[in-house]
């Protein structure tokens, strides 16, 4: 699997009003006490990476009632302001780069329905932020994920 960044992919169809971001990439940690998450939480390598076109605090205010956030409170670890780029496309690139780090677990929601979280990854905050930086500066193609360690490493 690889990530190719096409020219203007991140900026197509977006324009920032002076001083206002087009959206945000956010990196969250969960406060969930689900036993299936305990081992990952213990390593410090469990983050949700998402995007929002509204303020992140507004987006996550009802996390306890949303399976997207594992029906638990979340902590904001990082917020990246997106200026003159499409935050959804940016998120898609991040998720593609982290494909091998996506967690594969089943959880049961408050209604007893089984679900599979999709935007949660077995990486730490610093790795997630570094990936975002490398996508923005155009050097992400020089890196790959070490799937065992869950860190980004330079190719070659």
Language-model features: locations:
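Non-catalytic accessory segments flanking enzymatic or RNA/DNA-binding domains
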Residues: 1-156
